[in-house]
C-alpha cells in the first residue's frame, strides 16, 4: 500500500474519531442540558455551609453549589441557570418533573430511590441547638415528653431526628429562616441541623447551646435525575477532579468555609 493510501486511511480514521467524539459530546449535552442550559437546583437559606446558597443583593446567587454549578457548566460548554428551592426536600420532589439537571444535596436511602448520586464532597455531624435558658444539656434531657423540636421539612436531618428521638414529636417547617426565628423567640426548644450551621447560629442567638453529641452523619453529594447514565458519568468525573484539583477547596474558601475541611468519608 502506498504512503498516500496510508495517509488517506489515517486521515479518514482521525475524521471518524473526531466525529464520534463530537457526537458523544452532543449526546451528553442533550441528556444533561436538554434546554441548552445546565439547570442547577439550589436550596436558598442564610444557613451557609456546603449545601445552602444565598440570594445576593444584586439578585444573583452565591454559595458552594453555585460555584460548582458554574464550573460544571463551563466544562460542558453551556450556560448555567440556577433553579431555587426553599429546602432540599423540594429539590427532591422536583427530581421526577424534569425541573433541574444537576444538584448538590444531602444523600440518604430515601433519596437514592428518586435520583442518582455521584461522589460525596461533605460529611457533617447532625445535632441539636437548644434555646437560651433551656435546662436541656444532652440527648437524654432533650428526649422528653413535651419538648418541641423543629427541623427543615422533608430533609435527611428531619428523618434522622425522627428516628433518633423516641418521646419527642419533631415538627417540620419549610425554611431555615422560619425555624431560626422560632428559636430566637423561644417558641421551640431545639432545632436539628448540622453542627457547623448550628455553631454559626449560636453566635447569632446569644444564650443558645449546641449539644455535644451527634445523632447522625449527613453526607452531601452531587446528584442527577434517575436514568441519566451519561450525566451521572460526567458529574462523577467532574467531582472527582474537583476534589483533587482544588476546585471544591476554592468554592469553600470563596463562601466563608476556609476553616472547613473537604470530607469525603
Predicted regions and their residues:
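A ligand-binding cleft/hinge motif common to bilobed small-molecule-binding domains
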Residues: 89, 106-114, 160-163, 184-216
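Short helix-initiation/N-cap motifs at beta->coil->alpha
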Residues: 66, 82-93, 137, 171-185, ...
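Periplasmic-binding protein-like
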Residues: 123-132, 195, 199-240, 258-265
Amino acid at each position: 500500500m502506498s504512503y498516500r493510501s496510508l495517509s488517506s486511511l489515517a486521515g479518514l480514521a482521525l475524521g471518524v474519531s473526531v466525529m464520534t467524539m463530537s457526537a458523544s459530546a452532543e449526546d451528553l449535552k442533550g441528556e444533561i442540558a436538554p434546554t441548552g442550559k445546565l439547570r442547577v437546583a439550589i436550596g436558598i437559606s442564610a444557613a451557609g455551609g456546603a449545601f445552602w446558597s444565598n440570594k445576593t443583593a444584586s439578585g444573583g446567587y452565591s454559595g458552594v453549589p453555585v460555584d460548582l454549578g458554574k464550573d460544571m457548566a463551563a466544562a460542558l460548554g453551556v450556560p448555567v441557570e440556577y433553579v431555587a428551592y426553599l429546602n432540599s426536600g423540594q429539590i427532591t420532589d422536583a427530581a421526577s418533573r424534569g425541573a433541574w439537571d444537576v444538584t448538590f444535596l444531602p444523600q440518604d436511602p430515601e433519596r437514592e430511590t428518586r435520583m442518582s448520586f455521584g461522589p460525596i464532597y461533605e460529611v457533617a455531624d447532625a445535632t441539636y441547638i437548644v434555646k437560651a435558658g433551656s435546662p436541656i444539656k444532652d440527648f437524654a434531657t432533650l428526649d422528653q415528653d413535651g419538648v418541641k423540636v423543629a427541623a427543615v421539612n422533608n430533609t435527611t436531618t428531619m428523618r434522622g431526628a425522627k428516628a433518633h428521638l423516641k418521646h419527642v414529636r419533631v415538627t417540620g417547617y419549610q425554611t431555615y429562616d422560619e425555624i431560626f426565628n422560632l428559636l430566637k423567640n423561644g417558641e421551640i426548644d431545639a432545632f436539628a441541623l448540622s453542627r457547623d450551621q448550628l455553631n454559626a447560629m449560636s453566635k447569632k442567638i446569644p444564650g443558645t447551646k449546641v449539644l455535644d453529641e451527634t445523632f447522625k452523619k449527613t453526607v452531601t453529594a452531587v446528584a442527577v435525575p434517575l436514568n441519566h447514565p451519561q450525566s451521572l458519568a460526567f458529574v462523577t468525573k467532574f467531582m472527582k477532579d474537583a476534589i483533587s484539583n482544588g476546585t471544591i477547596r476554592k468554592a469553600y474558601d470563596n463562601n466563608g468555609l476556609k476553616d472547613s475541611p473537604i470530607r469525603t468519608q
